[in-house]
């Protein structure tokens, strides 16, 4: 939750006027629980969405980086409160995305062309099964960690939110 990519996501969404909520999945950082191969982590996402809707948030967007994008993509099929989703470097070379079916909420996927965990070609192959109208933004030179490329990532997110604002 405290890395350059998540910090950029939070900053850009807040600057665009969004209320943001970020959390560590179970067993990460100071969070309780044990890693649950994505199953329990989906429950974490659903609990966070429930928390927000109980506080009057009606329009919800999800944005996830790496493992978080995978868990979000799996969890979103079981909720009806999410309007849009952004995936940053979905780890398609590392996690099984085959069970992510048609998900119209997926609007934007961002990956670096040097990312070996989220290879652009694999994402291009999977994207039509997730949402054929989703946009893939490739950041030249960026790897999975976006060191030296967070400014470009923030520009991509800012443009997306300007076009798809709250």
Residue map of PLM features:
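Serine-hydrolase catalytic machinery in alpha/beta-hydrolase-like enzymes
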Residues: 1-55
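Alpha/beta-hydrolase active-site loop signature
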Residues: 25-29, 92, 143
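Short beta-strand/loop motif that positions the catalytic acidic residue
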Residues: 103-111, 115
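Acidic catalytic loop of the alpha/beta-hydrolase fold
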Residues: 113-118, 144-145
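Short alpha-helix in the alpha/beta-hydrolase fold that links the catalytic acid
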Residues: 119-127, 151
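Catalytic histidine neighborhood in serine/cysteine hydrolases
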Residues: 129-145
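Catalytic histidine-centered segment of alpha/beta-hydrolase-like enzymes
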Residues: 142-154
